[in-house]
Protein backbone atom coordinates (compact mmCIF):
# COMPACT_ATOMS: atom_id res chain seq x y z
CA UNK A 1 0.00 0.00 0.00
CA UNK A 2 1.45 3.34 -1.06
CA UNK A 3 1.99 6.18 1.40
CA UNK A 4 2.32 9.87 0.50
CA UNK A 5 4.82 11.90 2.53
CA UNK A 6 4.64 15.68 2.12
CA UNK A 7 6.24 18.53 4.03
CA UNK A 8 3.75 18.56 6.92
CA UNK A 9 1.53 15.57 6.20
CA UNK A 10 1.46 11.82 5.65
CA UNK A 11 -1.39 10.19 3.71
CA UNK A 12 -1.89 6.44 4.19
CA UNK A 13 -5.56 5.80 3.39
CA UNK A 14 -5.71 4.00 0.01
CA UNK A 15 -8.57 6.11 -1.35
CA UNK A 16 -6.92 9.36 -0.25
CA UNK A 17 -3.59 8.25 -1.76
CA UNK A 18 -5.29 7.51 -5.07
CA UNK A 19 -7.20 10.82 -5.02
CA UNK A 20 -4.06 12.83 -4.23
CA UNK A 21 -2.01 11.15 -6.96
CA UNK A 22 -4.84 11.52 -9.48
CA UNK A 23 -4.98 15.24 -8.66
CA UNK A 24 -1.24 15.40 -9.42
CA UNK A 25 -1.72 13.67 -12.79
CA UNK A 26 -0.36 10.29 -11.71
CA UNK A 27 -2.12 6.94 -12.07
CA UNK A 28 -2.19 4.76 -8.97
CA UNK A 29 -3.81 1.36 -8.49
CA UNK A 30 -3.38 -1.42 -5.98
CA UNK A 31 -3.30 -4.97 -7.35
CA UNK A 32 -2.97 -8.24 -5.48
CA UNK A 33 -0.14 -10.44 -6.71
CA UNK A 34 -1.03 -14.11 -7.25
CA UNK A 35 -0.27 -16.29 -4.22
CA UNK A 36 1.24 -18.84 -6.61
CA UNK A 37 4.19 -16.43 -7.05
CA UNK A 38 4.84 -15.84 -3.33
CA UNK A 39 7.58 -18.46 -3.00
CA UNK A 40 9.60 -17.27 -5.97
CA UNK A 41 9.06 -13.58 -5.13
CA UNK A 42 10.33 -14.24 -1.61
CA UNK A 43 13.80 -14.92 -2.98
CA UNK A 44 16.28 -12.05 -2.89
CA UNK A 45 17.51 -12.50 -6.46
CA UNK A 46 16.02 -14.21 -9.50
CA UNK A 47 17.58 -16.00 -12.46
CA UNK A 48 16.47 -15.06 -15.97
CA UNK A 49 14.32 -18.22 -16.06
CA UNK A 50 12.68 -17.27 -12.75
CA UNK A 51 12.00 -13.76 -14.05
CA UNK A 52 10.28 -15.28 -17.08
CA UNK A 53 8.23 -17.52 -14.77
CA UNK A 54 7.09 -14.46 -12.80
CA UNK A 55 6.21 -12.53 -15.96
CA UNK A 56 4.25 -15.55 -17.23
CA UNK A 57 2.35 -15.64 -13.94
CA UNK A 58 1.44 -11.98 -14.44
CA UNK A 59 0.59 -12.25 -18.15
CA UNK A 60 -3.11 -11.63 -17.42
CA UNK A 61 -2.22 -8.20 -15.97
CA UNK A 62 -0.06 -7.37 -19.01
CA UNK A 63 -2.92 -8.38 -21.33
CA UNK A 64 -5.26 -6.00 -19.46
CA UNK A 65 -2.76 -3.14 -19.60
CA UNK A 66 -2.05 -3.71 -23.31
CA UNK A 67 -5.77 -3.32 -24.05
CA UNK A 68 -6.24 -0.32 -21.73
CA UNK A 69 -3.04 1.62 -22.39
CA UNK A 70 -1.34 0.17 -25.46
CA UNK A 71 1.79 -1.21 -23.79
CA UNK A 72 3.88 -3.34 -26.12
CA UNK A 73 6.54 -4.83 -23.86
CA UNK A 74 7.36 -5.53 -20.24
CA UNK A 75 10.25 -6.76 -18.17
CA UNK A 76 11.08 -7.47 -14.56
CA UNK A 77 13.71 -5.50 -12.70
CA UNK A 78 15.15 -6.98 -9.50
CA UNK A 79 17.20 -4.69 -7.28
CA UNK A 80 18.82 -5.47 -3.94
CA UNK A 81 21.98 -4.65 -2.02
CA UNK A 82 23.99 -7.49 -3.60
CA UNK A 83 23.37 -6.51 -7.24
CA UNK A 84 26.77 -5.61 -8.74
CA UNK A 85 26.97 -1.86 -9.35
CA UNK A 86 23.75 -1.12 -7.45
CA UNK A 87 25.07 2.22 -6.15
CA UNK A 88 25.94 3.42 -9.65
CA UNK A 89 22.61 2.18 -10.95
CA UNK A 90 20.64 4.03 -8.26
CA UNK A 91 22.75 7.18 -8.77
CA UNK A 92 21.23 7.51 -12.26
CA UNK A 93 17.73 7.78 -10.85
CA UNK A 94 18.02 9.37 -7.40
CA UNK A 95 18.41 12.88 -8.87
CA UNK A 96 15.49 14.90 -10.20
CA UNK A 97 14.85 13.98 -13.84
CA UNK A 98 12.20 13.43 -16.47
CA UNK A 99 11.70 10.89 -19.25
CA UNK A 100 10.16 11.68 -22.62
CA UNK A 101 7.97 8.57 -22.25
CA UNK A 102 5.78 7.57 -19.34
CA UNK A 103 7.31 5.46 -16.55
CA UNK A 104 5.10 2.59 -15.42
CA UNK A 105 5.85 0.26 -12.50
CA UNK A 106 3.98 -2.58 -10.82
CA UNK A 107 5.73 -3.39 -7.55
CA UNK A 108 5.48 -7.12 -6.87
CA UNK A 109 7.95 -7.42 -3.97
CA UNK A 110 9.95 -5.12 -1.73
CA UNK A 111 9.60 -1.36 -1.56
CA UNK A 112 11.03 1.93 -2.73
CA UNK A 113 10.43 5.66 -2.90
CA UNK A 114 9.38 7.78 -5.85
CA UNK A 115 9.88 11.49 -5.23
CA UNK A 116 8.13 14.21 -7.21
CA UNK A 117 8.07 17.93 -7.72
CA UNK A 118 4.76 18.76 -9.36
CA UNK A 119 3.27 22.26 -9.45
CA UNK A 120 6.18 23.43 -7.30
CA UNK A 121 5.39 20.96 -4.51
CA UNK A 122 7.78 18.26 -3.34
CA UNK A 123 6.35 14.96 -2.10
CA UNK A 124 7.32 11.30 -1.89
CA UNK A 125 5.35 8.16 -2.67
CA UNK A 126 6.53 5.15 -0.70
CA UNK A 127 5.54 2.13 -2.80
CA UNK A 128 5.38 -1.54 -1.88
CA UNK A 129 4.02 -4.89 -2.98
CA UNK A 130 0.87 -4.52 -5.05
CA UNK A 131 1.32 -0.84 -5.92
CA UNK A 132 0.98 0.17 -9.58
CA UNK A 133 2.07 3.67 -10.55
CA UNK A 134 2.20 5.40 -13.91
CA UNK A 135 4.21 8.61 -14.19
CA UNK A 136 3.39 10.70 -17.27
CA UNK A 137 6.15 11.77 -19.65
CA UNK A 138 8.02 14.93 -18.64
CA UNK A 139 7.08 14.64 -14.95
CA UNK A 140 9.79 15.73 -12.51
CA UNK A 141 10.67 12.75 -10.34
CA UNK A 142 13.38 10.58 -8.82
CA UNK A 143 13.54 7.06 -7.42
CA UNK A 144 15.51 5.33 -4.71
CA UNK A 145 15.32 2.16 -2.70
CA UNK A 146 14.26 2.53 0.92
CA UNK A 147 15.99 1.01 3.96
CA UNK A 148 15.02 -2.54 2.88
CA UNK A 149 17.26 -2.16 -0.21
CA UNK A 150 15.06 -4.58 -2.14
CA UNK A 151 12.45 -4.25 -4.86
CA UNK A 152 11.01 -6.29 -7.71
CA UNK A 153 9.02 -4.31 -10.25
CA UNK A 154 7.44 -5.06 -13.59
CA UNK A 155 8.14 -2.27 -16.06
CA UNK A 156 5.71 -1.64 -18.91
CA UNK A 157 6.72 0.08 -22.16
CA UNK A 158 5.08 1.56 -25.21
CA UNK A 159 8.49 2.49 -26.60
CA UNK A 160 12.01 2.14 -25.15
CA UNK A 161 13.38 5.28 -26.80
CA UNK A 162 12.21 7.66 -24.06
CA UNK A 163 14.14 6.00 -21.26
CA UNK A 164 17.22 8.16 -20.99
CA UNK A 165 16.86 10.38 -17.92
CA UNK A 166 16.94 14.12 -18.61
CA UNK A 167 18.18 15.77 -15.41
CA UNK A 168 16.36 18.83 -14.08
CA UNK A 169 17.64 21.70 -11.91
CA UNK A 170 15.51 21.37 -8.78
CA UNK A 171 15.75 25.08 -7.95
CA UNK A 172 13.88 25.89 -11.17
CA UNK A 173 10.84 23.74 -10.37
CA UNK A 174 10.52 23.92 -6.58
CA UNK A 175 8.40 26.80 -5.24
CA UNK A 176 8.72 26.23 -1.49
CA UNK A 177 12.01 24.57 -0.60
From Swiss-Prot:
SUPFAM superfamilies: RmlC-like cupins. It holds the Pfam family ARD. It catalyses: 1,2-dihydroxy-5-(methylsulfanyl)pent-1-en-3-one + O2 = 3-(methylsulfanyl)propanoate + CO + formate + 2 H(+); 1,2-dihydroxy-5-(methylsulfanyl)pent-1-en-3-one + O2 = 4-methylsulfanyl-2-oxobutanoate + formate + 2 H(+). The record marks 105 as: Important to generate the dianion. Binds 1 Fe(2+) cation per monomer. Binds 1 nickel ion per monomer. Monomer. This is Acireductone dioxygenase. It comes from Leptospira biflexa serovar Patoc (strain Patoc 1 / ATCC 23582 / Paris). The lineage of its organism: Bacteria, Pseudomonadati, Spirochaetota, Spirochaetia, Leptospirales.
